[in-house]
Regions:
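Short, charged, intrinsically disordered terminal tails
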Residues: 193, 199-215
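Short proline/glycine- and acidic-rich turn/helix-capping motifs at secondary-structure junctions
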Residues: 172-179, 209-215
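Basic, Lys/Arg-rich alpha-helical nucleic-acid-recognition elements, primarily the DNA-binding modules
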Residues: 1-49, 56-59
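A glycine-centered beta-loop-beta connector
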Residues: 27, 35-51, 98, 106-121
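Tandem CBS (Bateman) regulatory domains
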Residues: 1-10, 49-86, 90-99, 113-114, ...
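Short basic, glycine-rich beta-strand/loop surfaces that mediate nucleic-acid
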Residues: 179-188
Length: 215
């Protein structure tokens, strides 16, 4: 999946000379937390978050204070080193940017112009859709040797039980580099037969692992 499939293309922007008060009103009206700051050519020159606004106007939270700070221009508080993405970037690459740089939104540029934006909420919804977690079904986690063809073998056992696989995730076993964990989302509310067959074939089923499920 690529970025242009999940990005929002209607992006609220402001100029560097707009006031902090304008940003606050826009955030409240549109229920957003980030505003890209652009020039007349729609090139991103900064970004302002709700945290930047709070840090830039601490006195407005005191009853006896002046609200003159609200008239300060956004260029005084905006972040200028903006990390950006491209519409053809893979979603997992963008997720890595969020993780590595601890950001919560990413302006998307094409030919240096702003064409969209992605937030951490967008990534969360995408993860839910990719894993099928929003659909009825069951999750099965299996510890398997790290070798070629193992995914095909385990999927074959699930297939023999006429259970449709909604999604598959694969990640390393943190305790043993010779193993990996397969996480299946299957379209059945009762995975007992699948689990029993997996265990009969010698696979280590990590989840479900509860009373009533044979070992």
């Amino acid at each position: 999946m690529i970025v242009e499939e999940i990005m929002k293309t209607k992006v609220e922007t402001l100029k560097a000379d707009d006031t902090i008060e304008t940003a606050i009103k826009l955030m409240r009206e549109k229920k957003i937390k980030h505003i890209p700051i652009t020039n007349d050519a729609l090139e991103v020159i900064g970004i302002v978050s709700d945290r930047d606004v709070k840090d830039g106007t601490p006195s407005i939270f005191h009853d006896d204070s002046s609200t003159s700070e609200l008239q300060n221009p956004l260029k005084l508080i905006m972040k200028k080193d903006v990390i950006t993405g491209h519409p053809l970037d893979f979603v997992e690459e963008v997720a890595a940017l969020f993780y590595e740089h601890r950001i919560s939104c990413l302006p998307i540029l094409k030919e240096k112009k702003l064409v969209g934006i992605i937030t951490e909420t967008d990534l969360l919804y995408t993860l839910i859709q990719l894993t099928g977690a929003h659909q009825p079904g069951s999750q099965i986690e299996v510890k398997v040797p790290h070798k070629a063809g193992i995914l095909y073998e385990v999927a074959g056992i699930i297939r023999r039980n006429n259970s449709n696989i909604q999604s598959v995730l694969v990640y390393p076993d943190k305790k043993d580099e010779n193993f990996k964990i397969l996480v299946f989302r299957v379209r059945t509310m009762n995975p007992m037969n699948v689990i029993d067959d997996l265990k009969k074939e010698g696979y280590d089923v990590l989840w479900p692992n509860m009373p009533g499920i044979s070992s």
